[in-house]
């Protein structure tokens, strides 16, 4: 006979523990003198449980003890036993994180060394994030999630992602940052008004500050659109041109020298951007989990400027970054998303040279990732019947097509609320080869996933714009008034919830 403990371990039944626990309850009720039959009575209950010869959980054994005490003349002992059981449950619940946090701080558990390859658990900023995450997970499991969802997660039936960021109301998963709105219309970071920049080098620096602030207010990956920086390339070129014209330089020479200066500024801006993203640490204890979307046709008016930015990003990624030893390495971020379209997929196309450069970058640095505009337009069709091309979020999932109130496509400034994954192989194994049972189990577990996702949605729906102003008030995701609920942004397709699956290839 085995007993399943609360942590899932199976141990051999030990009758002496039953006798000891019941005897403690007798001692509390009869402190001066125990009834003469105390030990034989306790032993009889233990014998009855052992005689069942079936595997039980700790909770099932305790329930049997309570029923037998209540059926005897010792109902007062039953009451004391229930109180004892409840007090110990409170003790267990109030002390669930100490061991985990100690293992993290002392480096005793291999889990923390491999939990996230982008985080170093020896660094204090990462440890601070992990400690907060341990606390959030503990609160989530004990108070916030339904017990059957916690149980399904523990058993591997489903996976409830990111419980370490669930306790707070405002934290969502991934997003497409509306950099265009924030740069063109200004934004506010930590109470400081940031107006529209007038040169690329300034826009690039502000962008990294925005990225750090946004990724500190969410827990997934963020994506920006490189074409949102393209207008500032033109602004810089005009700035340099005016500089030379003011010195009496001819138009032709001014244009030539301005372009030369602009090329240098592009290189400096991209280098600044890359070093800022990789050297800054957000409140998640890591560099911002960022992707850069590189699509030539997103802003046709600034296609040439977008091409210049793409080229420089690829060249600098091929070069790599120096590590602390001075050797060039492949940086983790930003990830690059390169879109293949009609004007860059054949040798005759005008931007074929960029695709060649992207391939060289892939060969050396394993980036960029490639997106087919043709397939996107086929699969991402909006209510107007038009196909759309846009970036995936940092987590590599795509938003669904969406039209705003004016009937225009809207992607940048949208987000994902959270993720739950179903374990499909477990559904198959649990069905035992019975297809009818398989579909029944699949329906049951999908409904469990639906409820888990609904928990995510309802938790986020309690937030107001003030909990993360950079997101909800100052343009990254919305321009809501102070104190306004974010609830409307969680409905009608503006944001998404993701159902993942594990086990299919």
Kindly give the residue locations of the regions a language model identified.
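Extended amphipathic alpha-helical segments enriched in small hydrophobics
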Residues: 499-505
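Short, hydrophobic beta-strand segments
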Residues: 45-50, 290-294, 298, 505
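Conserved catalytic cores of very large enzyme subunits
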Residues: 87-91, 97-494
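Charged, amphipathic alpha-helical regulatory modules used
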Residues: 1-107
């Amino acid at each position: 006979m085995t007993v399943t403990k609360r942590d899932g371990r199976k141990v051999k039944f030990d009758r002496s523990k039953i006798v000891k626990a019941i005897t403690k309850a007798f001692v509390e009720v009869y402190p001066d003198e125990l009834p003469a039959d105390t030990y034989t009575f306790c032993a009889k209950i233990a014998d009855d449980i052992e005689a069942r010869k079936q595997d039980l959980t700790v909770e099932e054994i305790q329930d049997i003890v309570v029923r037998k005490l209540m059926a005897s003349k010792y109902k007062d002992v039953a009451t004391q036993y229930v109180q004892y059981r409840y007090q110990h449950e409170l003790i267990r619940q109030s002390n669930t994180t100490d061991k985990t946090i100690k293992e993290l701080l002392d480096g005793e558990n291999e889990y923390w060394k491999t939990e996230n390859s982008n985080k170093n658990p020896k660094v204090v900023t990462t440890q601070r994030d992990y400690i907060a995450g341990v606390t959030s997970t503990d609160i989530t499991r004990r108070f916030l999630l339904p017990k059957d969802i916690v149980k399904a997660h523990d058993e591997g039936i489903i996976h409830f992602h990111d419980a370490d960021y669930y306790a707070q109301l405002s934290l969502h998963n991934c997003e497409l940052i509306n950099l265009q709105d924030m740069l063109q219309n200004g934004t506010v970071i930590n109470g400081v008004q940031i107006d529209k920049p007038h040169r690329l080098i300034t826009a690039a620096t502000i962008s990294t500050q925005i990225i750090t602030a946004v990724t500190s207010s969410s827990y997934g990956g963020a994506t920006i659109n490189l074409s949102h920086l393209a207008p500032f390339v033109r602004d810089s070129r005009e700035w340099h041109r005016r500089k030379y014209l003011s010195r009496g330089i001819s138009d032709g020479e001014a244009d030539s020298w301005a372009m030369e200066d602009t090329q240098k500024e592009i290189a400096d801006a991209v280098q600044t951007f890359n070093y800022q993203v990789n050297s800054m640490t957000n409140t998640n204890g890591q560099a911002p989990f960022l992707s850069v979307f590189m699509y030539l046709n997103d802003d046709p008016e600034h296609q040439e400027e977008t091409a210049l930015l793409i080229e420089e990003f690829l060249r600098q990624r091929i070069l790599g970054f120096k590590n602390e030893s001075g050797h060039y390495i492949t940086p983790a971020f930003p990830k690059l998303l390169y879109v293949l379209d009609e004007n860059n997929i054949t040798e005759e196309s005008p931007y074929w040279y960029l695709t060649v450069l992207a391939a060289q970058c892939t060969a050396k640095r394993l980036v960029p990732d490639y997106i087919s505009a043709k397939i996107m337009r086929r699969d991402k069709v909006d209510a107007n019947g038009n196909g759309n091309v846009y970036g995936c979020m940092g987590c590599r999932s795509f938003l669904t097509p969406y039209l705003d109130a004016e009937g225009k496509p809207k992607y940048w400034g949208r987000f994902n609320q959270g993720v739950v994954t179903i374990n499909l192989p477990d559904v198959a194994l649990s069905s035992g080869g019975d297809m009818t049972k398989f579909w029944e189990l699949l329906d049951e577990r999908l409904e469990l996933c639906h409820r888990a996702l609904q928990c995510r949605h309802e938790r986020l729906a309690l937030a107001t714009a003030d909990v993360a102003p950079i997101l909800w008030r100052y343009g990254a995701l919305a321009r809501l008034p102070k104190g306004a609920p974010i609830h409307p942004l969680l409905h009608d397709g503006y944001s998404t919830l993701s159902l993942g699956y594990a086990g299919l290839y």
